[in-house]
Amino acid sequence: ARMQESYPEHFIGLAVHNGDPMVYAEYDDGMGNLIGGYPSSLVDRVADIDPSVMEPDFLERVVLDASAELCLSASMDEENMIMTVTLEVTPTVAITNDWKVAVALSENGVTGTTTQWAQANYYSGGGSGELSGAGHDWHLEANPIPAANMEYDHVARVIMPSFLGMDDSFPEGGAVETAYSFDFEIPVSSDWDLDKIHVIGMLMDDNGLIDNGNQLDCTLALANTCGEPALGTEKTIVAAQEGLKVYPNPANDQIGITAVLTNNEKHQLTVVDVMG
């Protein structure tokens, strides 16, 4: 939750649960092959790191140029409770036939009342470091934290077609500035609150790492049309695509910045180091 609050336009969280009512086997098994145990975190599926030190890894990855632009839209068959999610991928550089796509759904505000909904707290007592977020100073709280005190965000509900992505997504590779569209039919549980669901699209490179992702609230995805700007979002300048240059790189105490701005809108520049 803290990462989402700090980087709302760039951070896409998926919380994978294990041994509680929110467990989703496809994600739990896939995550389990990449980590040594819980709690753990992955930034773009690169390396197993403690959640308390996720931010530096995120800041190193988020500045990398993505290889494609992603657009999301969705439609809902309410009678059969099937959501069709469309992911449109437009490469900005040529990609090979080993790249894959996937879509996922996550849910915020998930709660329960039984003891199974209590949260195991690895950080209780402070011996494993300090962690604050989601309304908790985890190192100051009990283990477990009672269900009555927990509200879970970013809960991974489904990933399609699998954790590893869709085989043969680009059988002949992906050409620059060519849009590739993928449709995924997702059964929607009556236990989910669609007003709190996020629709997530992801592009995986030939090493299985996440190259780029996109996220929309479900209500926005249902109203969105690919080929047009996503509703409720702002345009972000991306270095390789829109003429933003930062030099020298790496830098010590001074940098130069040049950018090509094509309109008279107000722009905001935020500079952070790897520690945020």
Language-model regions, residue ranges each:
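Residue-level detector of alpha-helical hydrophobic segments embedded in or interacting with membranes
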Residues: M3, L34, G243-K245
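Short, flexible, glycine/charge-rich loop motifs used to bind or transfer phosphoryl groups or to couple energy/partner
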Residues: M3, G30-M31, T258-V260
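C-terminal outer-membrane/trafficking sorting elements
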Residues: T236-G276
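Typically the conserved alpha-helix immediately C-terminal to a functionally engaged Cys/Sec
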Residues: A1-Y7
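Short amphipathic alpha-helical surface micro-motifs
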Residues: A1, M83-T86, S181-D183, V238-Q241, ...
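Short, proline-centered helix/strand-breaking motifs
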Residues: A1, P39-L42, P248
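Short, conserved sequence motifs used for protein processing/export or organelle targeting and
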Residues: P8-A230
